[in-house]
Amino acid sequence: MCILRHISYLLKSQSSNVRSHVMKRDELNLGEGVIHSIPLIRKAIVYDFLGQLALEPTALAQLQEQADMPFALDTSTAEFIPFHAFSRLLSGLRRHLGATVFVSSLQLIAKHASINLKFNQATPENVITSLGLRALNVETSAHVTRVEAHASAFDQIETELFLTVYLHAYMKARYPNLQEPSAYYLPHPQGQPLTELQIRNDIPQFLGQEHLALEYPALEGIERINVCAEDKPFAYYVEQALSAYVGRVDMSLDVFSELIGISKRTVQRSLKQEGTSFREVKEALNFTFAKRVLIQRNSAVGDIAVHLGYADATQFVRAFKRANGITPLQWKKANQPYD
């Protein structure tokens, strides 16, 4: 994707200004009845991305740990991971690799991902769900085909570049005759170092835009797309964001709040509006995990209790029985498959 070969200066110019924390998004909580969501990215996208990185395993593991990324994704039953954790990983990768290598890696990985993950078969609904978008619009006028993505707020330009590259890979997979973009638009705000940035006169880039977008020379036959993400209960997003960490990290509400970039108060209030709590969502996931490893791995109750963060096996058994009416071993006996 040639337009991104010229953005390394942009990345280098702000290397000293990249914030290590995730912006708190209390501004999303505009009042009663507002639907909240947590940005998620499909695990398969991330797993493929990590598998293609040309990094020494120890270095990659350290970057993942610093970003609070879930580990052992290949054995996790989770479908999604929090996009903010992946966003922090992207920022760490850019600092580790340098701007030029980071950009070229994004391009190469996205190109291979379009084959590995069969982007040519993905529906628009698949795309917005997989990439954590709120909406995707594609329209063609007399001279321009415009691809516009509505995403939740991020404060890292690396995430915007990742989405730009992957959206381009999706469009090229669907329409092989599509030319290179004629312009691209990033929500990243204009800053003093960026106002002096000159990329290419024939492929302009615009910062401080409301939405991320790509524009191409018009191509006949491109279908008009106007799809929005399905609204779901906030508890669903909490469950999906937590799922990859269950049995690996005993996550408190404070840590979870930092992980997703939403204040603890907002998480509590949003769940309370739906008649549930963080503890209830977390316990339900814990018990699902426990049931799975009781059967599939024949794990001991004490080991499960430790993995799930309980003080001891007795505390876990009591919690399990309170929710399920029977003890873990009674449940295992009743659900053990016969040979």
Residue map of PLM features:
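Generic solvent-exposed, charged/amphipathic alpha-helical segments
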Residues: G51, R94, T164-H168, K172, ...
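Extended mid-to-C-terminal alpha-helical interaction segments
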Residues: L178, P189-D339
